[in-house]
């Protein structure tokens, strides 16, 4: 501001000076670029002789270049639009630039048991990644995948059978089928993060029959699933446990971060003591919470997952 402007403000009342200053700030902000938007579209490919589709979300104003890709396999009843609201990953598409992919399952659900359907779904994800890489969208060395609820078993199968495809894997309120646990041997140390509630009525923390709408599946315990990735990562003895701040003392749960020591790749568990079959940090309808158990409000699942992935991709 010039000298005349200063003299002018000096003659004004306090209220007038504040109003004038706000006007100047507004003029300055008017010249700034608008927040970047995320563009969405659909991908169609043929996989195994079947037409398959996925929703793609990308940063509209970023230059076209190979970028990190985050693939999210949702639970059976969750549509892509709903999961986008649940996770909040779209905000990261604006600020950090990953391409977000929400593949569509056939018949509304992913296969959670071994067999032709499980093989078909895994092949679809492989074919989808190949297309993203060949089209110059994906950075082959920064491909991440997340499995939520009944979308988790497909992700875990891929982690067991195709560890080299992914830079990092996250599994959220899901479980590992017993048949998979018996044969799972990741080919390399694989960065792995799991978020699980100890009071989950759908996916028992200590193992047992799942209660997914698609059917009941024998699952191993969370500890048994983690042990597979701990072994693959060559971790040492013991783990370090850190409590997250208890931001909501009335939510009936506490969240802890377990980090295994001496690993060649990070292996971490966000253990929600008293948590149900809900994504921590997501606000859902009370009727949903009552059916799925307590919802933890102390942590932001999307931020935890993205921070984990970002450490791997830098």
Residue ranges and their predicted role:
Residues 175-192, 208-209:
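Flexible "cap/lid" loop of the alpha/beta hydrolase fold
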Residues 41-144, 153-157, 161, 206, ...:
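Serine-hydrolase catalytic machinery in alpha/beta-hydrolase-like enzymes
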Residues 3-22:
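Bacterial N-terminal signal peptides that target proteins for export
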């Amino acid at each position: 501001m010039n000298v005349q402007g200063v003299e002018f403000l000096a003659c004004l009342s306090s209220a007038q000076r504040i109003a004038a200053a706000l006007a100047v700030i507004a003029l300055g902000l008017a010249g700034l670029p608008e927040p970047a938007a995320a563009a969405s579209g659909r991908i169609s490919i043929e996989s195994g002789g079947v037409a398959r589709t996925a929703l793609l979300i990308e940063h509209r104003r970023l230059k076209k270049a190979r970028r990190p890709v985050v693939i999210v396999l949702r639970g059976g009843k969750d549509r892509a639009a709903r999961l986008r609201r649940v996770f909040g990953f779209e905000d990261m598409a604006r600020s950090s630039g990953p391409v977000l992919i929400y593949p569509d399952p056939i018949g509304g659900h992913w296969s959670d048991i071994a067999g032709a359907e499980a093989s078909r779904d895994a092949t679809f994800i492989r074919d989808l990644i190949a297309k993203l890489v060949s089209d110059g969208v994906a950075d082959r060395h920064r491909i991440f995948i997340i499995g939520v609820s009944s979308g988790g078993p497909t992700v875990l199968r891929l982690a067991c059978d195709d560890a080299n495809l992914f830079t990092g894997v996250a599994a959220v309120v899901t479980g590992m089928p017993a048949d998979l646990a018996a044969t799972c041997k990741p080919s390399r140390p694989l960065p792995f993060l799991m978020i699980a509630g100890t009071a989950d009525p759908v996916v028992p923390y200590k193992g047992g029959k799942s209660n997914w709408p698609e059917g009941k599946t024998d699952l191993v315990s969370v500890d048994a699933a983690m042990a597979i990735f701990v072994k693959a990562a060559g971790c040492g003895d013991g783990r370090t446990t850190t409590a997250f701040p208890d931001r909501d003392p009335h939510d009936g749960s506490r969240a802890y971060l377990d980090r295994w020591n001496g690993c060649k790749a990070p292996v971490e568990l966000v253990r929600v003591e008293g948590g149900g079959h809900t994504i921590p940090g997501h606000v859902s309808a009370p009727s949903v919470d009552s059916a799925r158990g307590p919802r933890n409000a102390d942590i932001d699942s999307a931020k935890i997952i993205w921070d984990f992935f970002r450490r791997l991709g830098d």
